[in-house]
Amino acid sequence: MKAYIITIIKNSDSLDHAENCLQSIKNTDSELDAQIYLASTPESIFDVNWTWPLSGKKSCTKTNLFLTPYKTVDNKKRIAAAQSHYRLWKQCIHINEPIMILEHDALFTRKFEAPSTTDDVGA
C-alpha cells in the first residue's frame, strides 16, 4: 500500500519528524511504500470561499445549522492542513487504490499489514 507522509519541506522539525516516521516504517517491516509528500502551506493554498465563522457562532442560511468557530491560532494553517489531505484524497481516486495518509509525526510501533481490499470496501 502506498503511504504519503505530509511534510512541510522548508521546516526542519517537520522534515526530521517525517524521516523518523519513514524509519519507523522500515524498523517495523511494515507493508507500506512510503514517501514524503509536500504539504500545502499558507503561502501555497488555493483560493477558498471561507464561510465558516472565525469568531462567534452563526447560523448557516443553507442548512439552518449553528456553526461554531474552530479554535486555531492561524486559520490559514488549518486550511493548508485540510488542503494537504484533500489533495491526497484526490490522488487516491486518481490512482484508484487505497492509500495511507500520515502526518509527519506519526510513528509505527508494530508492523502494519496492508489489508486485502475489494471494490465494495467502504460502499
Which ranges hold each PLM region?
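An acidic/histidine-cluster motif and surrounding catalytic segment
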Residues: M1-L102, A106-A123
